[in-house]
C-alpha cells in the first residue's frame, strides 16, 4: 500500500499514509486491509507487473571486449533491483544495466560471472559491490531518450572499461 501511495499517486496525501500507519498499529497488517485497500494492492501489483514486462521489452544488447551486456529502461514504479532481476530471468548476458527514469543506473551481473561491477559504476561516478553497483546520470531519462542514452553508455564502457 505504501508503494501504491508513493508511486501511483503523484501527490500522496499524507493523511492516507498516516491512517494506514494507525490502522496497522491498531488492527495489525491483516486487520487494516479494507476492501478498498485490497483493490489498491491489486492495482499496484498489476501495474508493477506491466512495468516489469516493459523493462524486458526495452532490453538492448551489446558486446564489449567479449562480454555480453544487456541494458534496459525502467520507470520509477519498480526498483533497479526488481528490474534487473526480471531482465536476468529473461535475457542471457554477463552484465545487466538498468537505466532508471530518475537517471539512476543499476549494475548487476550473472551469477556465474566474475566481473567486478565497481569499475563499471566508477566510469559513471558511482560505486558499490563487485556483484551489484550503482551510479547516477545527470537528470531524468525519458523512454524517448533511452536509445540515445544507451548508446552513450555503450561508448563510455567501450572506451573506459578494462575487464
Name each model feature, range by range.
Residues 1-81:
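Glycine-rich, Lys/Arg-enriched anion-binding loops that position phosphate/diphosphate groups
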